[in-house]
């Protein structure tokens, strides 16, 4: 068989097969199998590379997306099978995530709710609307606590619901109002005209401060708040915190010997999340690249 392959460019295939006694069907089956094995070997190599480049954070869905970005064709069953053989798997999310809360006594309506009246059943329900058509239409914010032996850090970010980008953030050793104003200042410095934007939050005390209301009002930003005790009203932000903690914090708490180390890891993760971490919602692209491509199409 090897001789037939090597001499194929110099002699007619039918002659080589007749002399060697190899059947035509056998020859093509073997050639196709070798080609397939070579392709599988390359895909296996790519899967391992993607997995380790992302520190084991990707499961089969994101690995499949990234394979497509790199020009490789495969289906989810194949990727799952190869990952199983390699003994690698993505991070399994922990249970329901709850962000840091504080005193709550809401003062604003939830602008992300739509009232739905079913006259036939005499029933009224409310549907959440996180949909957008461009960046800077709907932002959301919240505060999350990171607790290690050395103490606590609090992360306060703003997330754009369109491309899931972290627009700005602040890491502090206490959840004070200076943290909130710093986060706002960074976001406003990045973007000029934000008139009409909805900025959503829970009913945390920070978002009820007079200065906070005034800063939003001055820029034509509409303030929105979740209903009391209803974390699903702010699920895009809650989901981000859950993903972040599953990927860089849970199970690694004891690796951080100081708050400075933890803060560096938080900053590094957000940089990674914005610039490298792909997701299905953003068509297999990281948030910032998705925004840039959308911007070119006049979407952001």
Identify the role of each PLM range.
Residues 1, 24-133, 230, 286-295:
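Basic, flexible linker segments flanking DNA-binding modules
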Residues 16-20, 27, 47, 63, ...:
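Mobile genetic element proteins and their domesticated derivatives, centered on retroelements
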Residues 148, 160-161:
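Short, acidic, Ser/Thr-enriched surface-loop or helix-capping motifs
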Residues 217-221, 243-300:
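C-terminal domain-tail junction helix/linker
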Residues 147, 151, 170-192:
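Active-site beta-loop-alpha junctions of metal-dependent nucleic acid enzymes
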Residues 10-13, 134, 148-154:
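Short, flexible loop/turn motifs enriched in small residues
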Residues 1-10, 15, 37:
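Residue-centric detector for conserved, function-critical "anchor" positions
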Residues 99-103, 201-203, 209-212, 223-245, ...:
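RNase H-like two-metal-ion nuclease catalytic core shared by retroviral integrases
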């Amino acid at each position: 068989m090897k001789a037939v392959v090597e001499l194929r460019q110099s002699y007619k295939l039918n002659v080589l097969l007749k002399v060697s006694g190899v059947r035509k069907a056998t020859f093509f089956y073997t050639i196709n199998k070798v080609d397939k094995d070579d392709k599988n070997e390359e895909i296996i190599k790519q899967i391992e590379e993607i997995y380790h480049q992302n520190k084991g954070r990707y499961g089969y869905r994101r690995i499949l997306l990234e394979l497509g970005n790199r020009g490789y064709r495969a289906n989810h069953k194949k990727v799952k099978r190869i990952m199983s053989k390699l003994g690698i798997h993505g991070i399994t999310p922990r249970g329901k995530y709850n962000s840091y809360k504080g005193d709550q006594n809401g003062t604003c309506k939830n602008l992300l709710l739509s009232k739905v009246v079913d006259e036939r059943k005499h029933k009224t329900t409310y549907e959440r609307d996180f949909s957008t058509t461009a960046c800077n239409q709907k932002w959301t914010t919240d505060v999350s606590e990171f607790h290690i032996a050395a103490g606590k850090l609090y992360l306060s970010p703003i997330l754009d619901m369109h491309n899931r980008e972290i627009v700005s953030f602040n890491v502090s050793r206490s959840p004070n109002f200076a943290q909130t104003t710093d986060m706002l200042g960074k976001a406003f410095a990045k973007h000029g005209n934000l008139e009409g934007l909805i900025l959503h939050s829970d009913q945390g005390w920070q978002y009820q401060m007079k200065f906070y209301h005034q800063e939003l009002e001055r820029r034509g930003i509409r303030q929105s708040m979740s209903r009391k005790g209803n974390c699903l009203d702010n699920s895009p932000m809650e989901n981000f915190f859950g993903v972040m903690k599953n990927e860089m914090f849970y199970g690694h708490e004891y690796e951080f010997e100081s708050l400075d180390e933890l803060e560096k890891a938080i900053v590094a993760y957000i940089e990674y999340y914005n610039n490298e971490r792909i997701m299905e919602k953003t068509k297999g692209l990281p948030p910032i690249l998705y925004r840039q491509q959308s911007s070119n199409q006049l979407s952001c």
